[in-house]
């Protein structure tokens, strides 16, 4: 089953230049114009591992910083080409001090700090107080920064996450709306529209090293959120960007034969077109360089580039990482994200197709409405045909082995969240979730404890919200409320004890924040704040009055 994703000649040529430069004692030529990601004006955004590859590798290999993300977020104080040339020359001198060189040439970035709650502040009040601390505005950024400018203010998650993230932001925006911060919701939506217009897609985050991938496509849901305030005018305004995002996810579909894949698109044996996660690069992630190299080294039977691509695709999924993507369910080196057709991604793309059809209808574009409506129906049927497990739940699909994955996970509820599930299958999925994923602190992510952060025992705010909304949409209000109240109690317990909200929670009954993964637990925290406010509206003190 071929995976038709050969690198273009320009990229191969760029890699040759990089290898030649790495072997030289002097500065290499400036990377060609084809290298890096061009924006709409033709300017390039070049990631740190491309701008000064030898220095980048030396810093990461020598672990100058405990977090590999730290250096790629640092600001070069001079032209990268000059820094690179000086490094290649100076590193040959006796007594060369790498740390001192970095200190002279880069300004380090700090973490996003949030203040403890004021005495007596309840959970909702504290979250409202956090929004200003998490808000950033970089309409212009210093030259050569890895940060990508955005025209309007935005809210970051917090901690080591100093930039805006795509799918995080939808759940953050839910909280902003609940706090009455409607202008900030519009600002963030406009920023994402700007990213689509500038780069052709919404990157993982607004960093140059994130441009080679996206994240779960929630832009249409952001437009829905804005439409609650201004009606169909929002759909008409953002129709061009909705269509551009759709084109990004469907690029490569033309000419595919059955059982082939290209970029994000997979054509199944029956001719159905579905999607997978993907990344345009097959190198270690810059922000997790050593970790990715170590992972690839544990799979000597696989080409390293294949492992790197699957790690990057796992990062695009937002579930980085999870037994969901692992062939053996335990070892990260067995990751095969690009071989899997994920149920959540395809449910979200179904919603995107439906929203484009709605926007076209509002714009009196009949052919457009009918075309996207037909695409949505074809996708819905393909999901029902292939992404359903006979045990009674929606499941991911292994397109290479032509069978559904034998593991339920929280993504099984996305077809309910997006409204594509039949009533009968929604009910069976709800029963399976109640039997297998319900924990003392809310909804489990998976049923496996692999040591990865998107596995047992962690519960994540966005997945709680998807579950609650999906179950409510199909009349399973009691189960939705049970999940929502359990998670709220978990958040409240951590807040009462530690005075903060965190990225993820241990929902096994330990009443603490979550663990696992590649970095320490982060607090702030954008999507936990947003979902908590929405759950308080539904199930908190005084809800429904």
UniProtKB/Swiss-Prot annotation:
Record-listed E.C. numbers = 3.2.1.28
The listed locations are: Periplasm
- Give the Gene Ontology MF terms in alphabetical order: alpha,alpha-trehalase activity; trehalase activity
Q: Which organism is it from?
A: Pseudomonas aeruginosa (strain ATCC 15692 / DSM 22644 / CIP 104116 / JCM 14847 / LMG 12228 / 1C / PRS 101 / PAO1)
Q: Where does substrate bind?
A: 160, 167-168, 204, 213-215, 285-287, 318, 518
Q: Which keywords does UniProt give here?
A: Glycosidase, Hydrolase, Periplasm, Signal
Position of the signal peptide: 1-30
Top-level taxon in the UniProt lineage? Bacteria
| Entry protein name | Periplasmic trehalase
């Amino acid at each position: 089953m071929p995976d038709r994703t050969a690198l273009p000649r320009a990229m191969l040529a760029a890699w040759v230049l990089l290898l030649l430069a790495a072997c030289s004692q002097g500065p290499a030529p400036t990377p060609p114009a084809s290298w890096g990601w061009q924006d709409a004006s033709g300017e390039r955004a070049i990631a740190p591992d491309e701008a000064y590859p030898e220095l980048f590798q030396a810093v990461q290999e020598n672990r100058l910083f405990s977090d590999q993300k730290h250096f790629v977020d640092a600001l070069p104080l001079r032209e990268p080409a000059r820094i690179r040339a000086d490094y290649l020359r100076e590193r040959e001198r006796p007594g060369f001090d790498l740390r001192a060189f970095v200190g002279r040439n880069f300004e380090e970035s700090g973490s996003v700090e949030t203040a403890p709650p004021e005495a007596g502040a309840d959970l909702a009040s504290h979250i409202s107080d956090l929004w200003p601390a998490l808000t950033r505005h970089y309409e212009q950024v210093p030259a050569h920064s890895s940060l990508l400018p955005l025209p309007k203010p935005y809210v970051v998650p917090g901690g080591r996450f100093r930039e805006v993230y795509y799918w995080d932001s939808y759940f953050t925006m839910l909280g902003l709306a609940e706090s009455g911060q409607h202008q900030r919701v519009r600002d963030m939506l406009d920023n994402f529209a700007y990213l689509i217009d500038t780069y052709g897609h919404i990157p993982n985050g607004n960093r140059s090293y994130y441009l080679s991938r996206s994240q779960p496509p929630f832009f249409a849901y952001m437009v829905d959120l804005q439409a609650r305030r201004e009606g169909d005018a929002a759909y008409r305004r953002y129709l061009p960007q909705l269509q551009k995002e759709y084109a990004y996810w469907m690029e490569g579909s033309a000419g595919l034969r059955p059982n082939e894949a290209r970029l994000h698109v997979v054509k199944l044996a029956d001719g159905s077109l579905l999607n997978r996660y993907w990344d345009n690069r097959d190198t270690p992630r810059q922000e997790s360089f050593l970790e990715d190299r170590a992972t690839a080294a544990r799979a000597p039977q696989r080409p390293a580039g294949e492992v790197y691509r699957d790690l990057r695709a796992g990062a695009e999924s937002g579930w980085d990482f999870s037994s969901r993507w692992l062939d053996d369910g335990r070892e990260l080196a067995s990751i095969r994200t690009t071989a899997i057709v994920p149920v959540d991604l395809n449910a979200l793309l179904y919603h995107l197709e439906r929203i484009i059809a709605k926007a076209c209808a509002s714009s009196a574009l009949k052919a457009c409405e009918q075309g996207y409506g037909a695409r949505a129906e074809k996708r819905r049927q393909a999901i029902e045909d292939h992404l359903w497990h006979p045990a009674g739940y929606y499941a991911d699909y292994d397109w290479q082995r032509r069978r559904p994955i034998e593991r339920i996970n929280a993504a099984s509820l996305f077809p309910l969240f997006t409204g594509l599930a039949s009533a009968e299958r929604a009910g069976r999925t709800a029963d399976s979730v109640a039997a297998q994923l319900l924990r003392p602190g809310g909804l489990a992510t998976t049923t496996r404890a692999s040591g990865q952060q998107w596995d047992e025992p962690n519960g994540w705010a966005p997945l709680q919200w998807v579950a609650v909304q999906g179950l409510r949409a199909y009349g399973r209000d009691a189960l939705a409320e049970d999940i929502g109240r359990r998670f709220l109690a978990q958040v409240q317990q951590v807040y009462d004890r530690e005075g903060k909200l965190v990225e993820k929670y241990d929902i096994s009954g330990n009443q603490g924040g979550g663990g696992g993964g590649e970095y320490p637990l982060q607090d702030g925290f954008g999507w936990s704040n947003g979902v908590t406010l929405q759950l308080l509206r539904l199930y908190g003190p005084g809800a429904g009055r």
